Amino acid sequence: MASFTASASTVSAARPALLLKPTVAISAPVLGLPPMGKKKGGVRCSMETKQGNVSVMGAGVSAAATAALTAVMSNPAMALVDERMSTEGTGLPFGLSNNLLGWILFGVFGLIWTFFFVYTSSLEEDEESGLSL
């Protein structure tokens, strides 16, 4: 893995008597981005099992009630569509977020179909051409 660093060090002097303090060299892993502080942190996951005195009959009834309630109350998920986001899974036809894209697709398909039609009309029709039955 290669790492690129960029650093700059400049000294400015307006007059010989007034020297400005030299700027400190700044090292960043990527040119143009500020350096990120190293934070120590993390995520700790754990799982524990709680065992209780749940009757089998009560669990079956509650599961059936939950399934019935879910079936009755389920609504389709609504996606947040922003211009910066992709249109996958948003319910837009063909994933087209702009009507102009549909016309472009239609025009390209029509242009290719026109070229194919003109090309096939200029072919000779004989027994081995496969264009006639």
UniProtKB/Swiss-Prot annotation:
Annotated Pfam families: PsbW (PF07123)
Record localization: Plastid, Chloroplast thylakoid membrane
Disrupted-gene phenotype: Plants have no obvious physical phenotype. However, there is no dimeric photosystem II (PSII) and there is only a 50% rate of normal oxygen evolution. There is an approximately 40% decrease in the amount of PSII and the oxygen evolving complex in these plants. The monomeric PSII that remains functions normally with respect to electron transfer.
Organism domain of life: Eukaryota
Membrane topology according to the record: Single-pass membrane protein
Residues passing through the membrane, by range: 100-120
Stromal topological intervals: 121-133
Entry annotated with the keyword Thylakoid: yes
Main location: plastid
Residue ranges annotated as Lumenal, thylakoid topological domain: 80-99
GO CC annotation: chloroplast thylakoid membrane; photosystem II
InterPro entries per record: PSII_PsbW_class2
Keywords assigned: Chloroplast, Membrane, Photosynthesis, Photosystem II, Plastid, Thylakoid, Transit peptide, Transmembrane, Transmembrane helix
Transit peptide: 1-53, 54-79
Subunit structure: Part of the photosystem II complex. PSII is composed of 1 copy each of membrane proteins PsbA, PsbB, PsbC, PsbD, numerous small proteins, at least 3 peripheral proteins of the oxygen-evolving complex and a large number of cofactors. It forms dimeric complexes. Found in monomeric, dimeric and in etioplastic PSII (i.e. before PSII is fully assembled and functional).
Protein family per UniProt: Belongs to the psbW family.
Protein name: Photosystem II reaction center W protein, chloroplastic
Gene (name only): PSBW
